[in-house]
């Protein structure tokens, strides 16, 4: 049995060939393949004059042209399908040209089950830009530079199995490791407490049976409430850095999580609750300062319509560090001190105008314990069904030892224009 699981893992960890073969077989029997895509321009300008280190894109952290080609199809019976999204981008701000496989997967479905193999984007949990049981990879560079929200999530090379035999739905994901895309000095300015001048390298987990990532979810409805339970055996997706001789090495420690969520109507709005426990099996006593201390995380959110075409959403989020005394004892000099209980509140206000062709959106993070903030206003206008433009900002501030305050020199404004075909 173990050998069979290991083999399935290796297949799921290197999806491109298998997905392409499955997609090709589906396309061969498809009644027709639907083609689409878009062309997009995205320019980001820093809001203040700052002294940038050598090698950092300073005045314009991003200046990107991107084209996406999408193809999808299914066979005549509808029980097999495929989807592919390929992006070609050129960012002159950092001299980067790449062909990116955003998604590439094949689907097989039946009345009581389905399977998806390939690169796919997955979203779990009920938080609005707050993630507890969603441990899948994310692109924080795209987020902090104002890319369309679809680019916050990165695709996982995975095998996803769904079963819906009755009132409960079951989902199992077997995936290879993929790290978050985290801010670096290529585009961002931030304090670095690690020694300067030492070379850095990261060691990513392998895809053998000991390093595979497995996540599961069970969900269902009780009256008008949706309930879900989650478990995962994954990795932290940001590197844990430590000095090793004459270099700095980043690893991705193991992460085990378990949690639950529920959402349903309360009054004239919707209440959302989610909680989870983050276990660091490589440092359960909290004495390795490079590995995140085990934590309890939770959020409560409420959203409702204020008036026609206007909605308001509020959230309160907390992280409670389990072994705080060990964390304080082993924290290296020069590193900012975290509170045992980190508290964050969020607010989202959305207003539609002009028959919903214009959308004003305001999202704000407020660090209640770290005394910092991150405000994201945006205005989008659809000139037609195919063409839209969005202007917005990423405004960070507050105390510099906070998550958002430490990035305040990276506040920016952006303009995105997209034509879809």
Predicted regions and their residues:
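Transmembrane beta-barrel strands of outer-membrane/channel proteins
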Residues: 37-45, 84-88, 117-119, 172-176, ...
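Hydrophobic, lipid-facing positions within transmembrane beta-strands of outer-membrane proteins
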Residues: 63-69, 101-104, 155-159, 212-216, ...
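Residue-level signature of outer-membrane beta-barrel architecture
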Residues: 33, 71-75, 107-110, 119, ...
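Outer membrane beta-barrel
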Residues: 72-190, 223, 398
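Repeated loop/turn-to-beta-strand initiation elements of outer-membrane beta-barrel proteins
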Residues: 33, 77-82, 112-115, 167-170, ...
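Outer-membrane beta-barrel "beta-signal"
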Residues: 349, 395, 407-421
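Detector for outer-membrane/organellar transmembrane beta-barrel domains
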Residues: 232, 263-285, 289-365
């Amino acid at each position: 049995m173990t050998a069979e699981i290991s083999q399935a893992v290796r297949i799921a960890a290197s999806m491109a060939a298998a997905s392409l073969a499955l997609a090709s077989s589906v396309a061969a029997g498809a009644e027709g393949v639907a083609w689409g895509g878009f062309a997009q321009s995205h320019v980001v300008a820093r809001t203040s004059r700052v002294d940038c280190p050598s090698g950092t894109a300073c005045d314009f952290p991003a200046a990107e042209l991107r084209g996406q080609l999408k193809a999808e199809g299914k066979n005549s019976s509808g029980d097999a399908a495929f989807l592919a999204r390929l992006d070609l981008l050129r960012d002159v701000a950092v001299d980067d040209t790449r062909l990116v496989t955003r998604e590439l997967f094949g689907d097989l479905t039946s009345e009581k089950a389905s399977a998806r193999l390939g690169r796919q984007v997955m979203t779990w949990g009920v938080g609005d830009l707050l993630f507890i049981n969603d441990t899948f990879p994310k692109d924080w560079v795209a987020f902090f530079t104002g890319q369309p929200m679809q680019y916050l999530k990165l695709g996982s090379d995975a095998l996803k199995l769904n079963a819906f035999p009755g009132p409960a739905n079951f989902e199992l994901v077997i995936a290879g490791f993929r790290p978050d895309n985290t801010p670096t000095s290529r585009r961002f300015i931030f304090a670095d407490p690690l020694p300067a001048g030492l070379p850095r390298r990261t060691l990513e987990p392998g895809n053998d049976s000991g390093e595979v990532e497995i996540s599961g979810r069970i969900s269902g409805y009780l009256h008008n409430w949706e309930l879900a339970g989650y478990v995962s055996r994954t990795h932290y997706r940001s590197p844990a850095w430590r000095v090793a001789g004459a270099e700095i090495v980043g690893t991705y420690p193991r992460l085990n999580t378990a949690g639950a969520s529920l959402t349903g109507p309360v009054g004239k709005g919707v209440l959302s609750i989610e909680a989870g426990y983050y276990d660091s099996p490589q440092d359960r006593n909290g004495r390795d300062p490079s590995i995140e201390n085990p934590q309890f995380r939770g959020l409560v959110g409420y959203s409702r319509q204020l008036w026609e075409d206007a909605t308001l959403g509020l959230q309160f989020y907390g992280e409670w560090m389990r072994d705080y005394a060990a964390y304080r004892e082993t924290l290296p000099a020069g590193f900012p001190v975290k509170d045992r209980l980190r508290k964050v509140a969020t607010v989202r206000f959305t207003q539609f105008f002009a028959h919903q062709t214009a959308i004003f959106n305001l999202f704000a993070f407020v660090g209640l314990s770290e005394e910092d903030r991150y405000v994201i206003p945006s205005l989008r206008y659809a000139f037609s069904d195919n063409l839209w433009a969005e202007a917005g900002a990423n405004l960070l501030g507050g105390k510099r030892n906070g998550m958002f305050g430490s990035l305040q020199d990276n506040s920016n404004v952006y303009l995105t224009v997209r034509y879809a075909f």
